[in-house]
Amino acid sequence: MEIKYLLTVFLVLLIVSDHCQAFPFSLIPHAIGGLISAIKGRRKRDLDGQIDRSRNFRKRDAELEELLSKLPIY
C-alpha cells in the first residue's frame, strides 16, 4: 500500500476510536440528569406545561377561525 492510503486509514481509525471512547462518558451525565429529574418529578411539570400550551394553541386557533369568519369575502 502507498503511504497516503495508510495515513488515511490510520486517521480514520484514530477518529473512530476517539468517538467510541468518548461515547460512554457522554452518556453518564445525561443518565445522572435523567435520574435526578425523575426523582424530582420534573417530567410531570413539563407535561403540565405542554398541556397548557396545547390549550392555548387551541384557543388561539378558535379565535383565528372566528376572526376569519367575520372578515368580508372579497
Curated annotation (Swiss-Prot):
Disulfide bridges in this chain: none
Signal peptide residue numbers: 1-22
Subcellular location: Secreted; Target cell membrane
GO CC list: extracellular region; membrane; other organism cell membrane
Positions bearing Lysine amide: 40
UniProtKB keywords: Amidation, Antibiotic, Antimicrobial, Cleavage on pair of basic residues, Cytolysis, Hemolysis, Membrane, Secreted, Signal, Target cell membrane, Target membrane, Transmembrane
Keyword flag Secreted: yes
Residues of the propeptide: 46-74
Summary of the tissues where the protein is detected: Expressed by the venom gland.
Biological process terms in GO annotation: defense response to bacterium; killing of cells of another organism
Keyword Membrane: yes
Function statement: Has antibacterial activity against the Gram-positive bacteria S.aureus (MIC=48 uM), the Gram-negative bacteria E.coli (MIC=120 uM), and the yeast C.albicans (MIC=64 uM). Causes hemolysis on horse erythrocytes.
Protein family per UniProt: Belongs to the non-disulfide-bridged peptide (NDBP) superfamily. Short antimicrobial peptide (group 4) family.
Annotated protein name in UniProt: Antimicrobial peptide 2
Biological source species: Androctonus amoreuxi (African fattail scorpion)
